[in-house]
């Protein structure tokens, strides 16, 4: 399927979120220029998820759905979807997050108009209470911390965060998401790209909602110790790379 943007989504334990997620994604202003690649990761809710997805496929031929018999982990799912698709641009979409209807269009437009930029990202609302409509969010919602791109800022925070849009050729230059980490491989990949010369740019508008899911891979309190270890390891790895660069 010849589409400009590949939307990659790992589907696991999505009974609560899958229908509203699909309503949100298919309402994107440029959805007709996208392929939504859903990969079922041996989900306990597979039967329900499949029924809902098949329903949406009846009206959207650009929804692709495949199912794995074993969950290989989030980032291996992403890699499989990236390697199994051809779109020039890629974005990830989490089933419990939500996008402003112009989100993908705004990110795509930036990348198409600025050839020197490799990754586009935006400002997001964040809450521990779930929201389905980004365009009608309560004004008291917090903003997820982000900043204009710099190597220094990226070295201290995963700036692209939960739904950036990036050029496929980054994977040709820098490889894929590492299976070394459970929740930090996206940050490690962006650092790998940036230290290799890739450029990123912030869209300084709220174009999404990030759900601080109490059962999420990176937000479940039970995973906090592991997450801290991963963050420290990634930070120290690229701090050393930065020192070597400046020294050289």
Question: What residues fall within each predicted segment?
Answer:
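Glycine-rich, basic loop-to-helix element that forms the pyrophosphate-binding segment
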Residues: 68-85
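A recurrent flexible, glycine/aromatic-enriched loop bordering the glycosyltransferase active site
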Residues: 146-165
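Short aromatic/hydrophobic "clamp" motif used to bind/position activated sugar donors
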Residues: 90
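Acidic donor-binding loop at a coil-to-helix junction in glycosyltransferase catalytic cores
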Residues: 182-189
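Acidic donor-binding segment of Leloir-type glycosyltransferases
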Residues: 26-66
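Conserved donor NDP-sugar-binding/catalytic core segment of glycosyltransferases
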Residues: 104-136
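Catalytic core of nucleotide-sugar-dependent glycosyltransferases
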Residues: 206-213, 219-246
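Short, well-formed alpha-helical segments that are part of the catalytic scaffolds
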Residues: 14-27
């Amino acid at each position: 399927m010849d589409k400009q943007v590949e939307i990659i989504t790992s589907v696991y334990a999505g009974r609560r979120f899958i229908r509203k997620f699909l309503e949100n994604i298919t309402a994107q202003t440029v959805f007709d220029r996208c392929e939504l690649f859903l990969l079922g990761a041996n989900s306990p809710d597979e039967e329900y998820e499949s029924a809902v997805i098949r329903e949406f496929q009846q009206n959207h031929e650009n929804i692709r759905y495949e199912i794995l018999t074993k969950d290989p982990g989030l980032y291996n799912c992403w890699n499989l979807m990236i390697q199994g698709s051809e779109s020039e641009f890629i974005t990830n979409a989490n089933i419990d997050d939500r996008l402003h209807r112009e989100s993908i269009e705004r990110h795509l437009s930036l990348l198409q108009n600025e050839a020197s930029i490799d990754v586009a990202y935006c400002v997001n609302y964040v809450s521990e209470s779930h929201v389905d409509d980004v365009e009608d969010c309560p004004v008291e919602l917090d903003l997820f911390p982000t900043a204009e791109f710099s190597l220094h800022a990226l070295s201290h925070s995963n700036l692209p965060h939960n739904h950036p849009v990036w050029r496929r050729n980054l994977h040709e230059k820098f490889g894929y998401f590492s299976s070394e980490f459970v929740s930090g491989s996206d940050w490690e990949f962006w650092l790998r790209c940036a230290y290799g010369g890739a450029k990123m740019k912030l869209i300084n508008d709220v174009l999404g909602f990030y759900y601080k899911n109490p059962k999420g891979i990176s937000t479940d309190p039970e995973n906090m110790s592991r997450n801290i270890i991963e963050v420290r390891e990634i930070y120290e790895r690229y701090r050393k790379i930065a020192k070597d660069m400046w020294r050289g």
